[in-house]
Every structure is written in structure tokens, then in C-alpha cells.
Design a protein with these regions (language model features):
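Alpha-helical elements of Rossmann-like donor-binding domains used by nucleotide-donor carbohydrate transfer enzymes
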Residues: 17, 21, 89-92, 96, ...
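Amphipathic, non-transmembrane alpha-helical scaffold segments
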Residues: 15, 61, 65, 69, ...
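Short, basic, alpha-helical segments at the C-terminal edge of helix-turn-helix-like DNA-binding modules
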Residues: 36, 66-73
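Basic, helix-initiating cap at the start of DNA-binding domains
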Residues: 1-42
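Short, hydrophobic secondary-structure boundary micro-motifs
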Residues: 35, 109-112, 120
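Hydrophobic alpha-helical connector segments
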Residues: 78-109
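Amphipathic alpha-helical packing segments from all-alpha helical-bundle domains
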Residues: 118-160
């Protein structure tokens, strides 16, 4: 007899387990160490289970790369809190973005230029549905910018 389907909360927990396992492997052993089997083993699941949540390793890698934005989100909100001028906020956001991107180039490349960059808006929304605490305390304009998928959309959002 087949197992009953997982509830949404259980699916989100398993989804988070895989993302956390992949993120830990990326952080501790580098991108080259990332395989579906290693991620599944670290998460405590069969590698076939991963395909219920991710299309392939690249898809999982994009989600795991989102972990690098946690510090970025928190610090960006803190630094932008006192600046009211939209252009100055825009310039600061880009300086901060570039500094973060140079610290984790593989993660930023995967997100904005990788195989699934065209799906980034959907990926961002799905990710923050499971990890809402990583957004921190953001004002509405920064929150809207962070949930845009493309860099063009992010720029437009910050300049409005």
C-alpha cells in the first residue's frame, strides 16, 4: 500500500532539510562536493526523494545558494534604514551587492546567471515561504526589491 501524501508542513520541512544539507556541503566542502546522493544522505533521505522537490542538482543548488542572502538581507536593511534618498539607496545597494557577490561568486552566479535564473522570482518566493525569518526586518521597498528575480527588476524597484 502506498504511503499517504505529505501535508504541506511536512513537505516544507523536507524541502528545508535538503536545502540546509546542500548549503552545509557548499559551505564546508565547496561546490564541487555537491552531489544529489551526498545531499540526500546528509539530510537523511533517499536520493530519489530529492526529485520530488527539485528538478536536478542545479535546481537544488539555486535554492541552497539563497542561504548566502541571509546576511545580505539583514545588513542591507540595517544600512539602508537611515538613507531616504532613492539614488543614494540604489548606489549603496549596488556597492553592498557587489561586495557580497565577490565573497560568494558561485552562489550569486547560480542565482542570477545560472540554468534556473529565468525562474528566480518563483524560486525566491518558494524559498522565503519556507525560510521567512531570513528576510529579517525590512521596509516595504527593500522587501519588494529582494523578491524580484532579475537584476533589472531589482534596479527598477530601488529607483522608484
Amino acid at each position: 500500500m502506498a504511503r499517504p501524501p505529505y501535508r504541506a508542513e511536512q513537505r516544507n520541512q523536507i524541502f528545508a532539510c535538503f536545502i540546509n544539507a546542500a548549503s552545509e556541503l557548499m559551505e564546508n566542502e565547496g561546490m564541487e562536493s555537491l552531489t544529489l546522493r551526498r545531499v540526500a544522505k546528509r539530510a537523511g533521505y533517499n536520493s530519489a526523494t530529492l526529485y520530488n522537490y527539485f528538478k536536478d542538482l542545479d535546481h537544488l543548488t539555486v535554492y541552497a545558494s539563497m542561504k548566502y542572502f541571509e546576511d545580505y538581507n539583514r545588513n542591507l536593511a540595517r544600512y539602508l534604514a537611515d538613507e531616504q534618498d532613492a539614488f543614494q539607496r540604489f548606489l549603496f545597494m549596488w556597492r553592498f551587492f557587489c561586495a557580497s557577490a565577490f565573497r560568494h561568486p558561485h552562489a550569486y552566479y547560480n542565482l542570477f546567471y545560472g540554468k534556473y535564473s529565468g525562474e528566480l522570482t518563483e524560486i525566491i518566493h518558494a524559498y522565503y515561504e519556507v525560510f521567512p525569518e531570513e528576510l529579517g526586518e525590512l521596509d516595504d521597498s527593500v522587501l519588494e526589491m529582494l523578491t524580484c528575480g532579475s537584476l533589472v527588476e531589482r534596479n527598477w524597484q530601488m529607483l522608484q
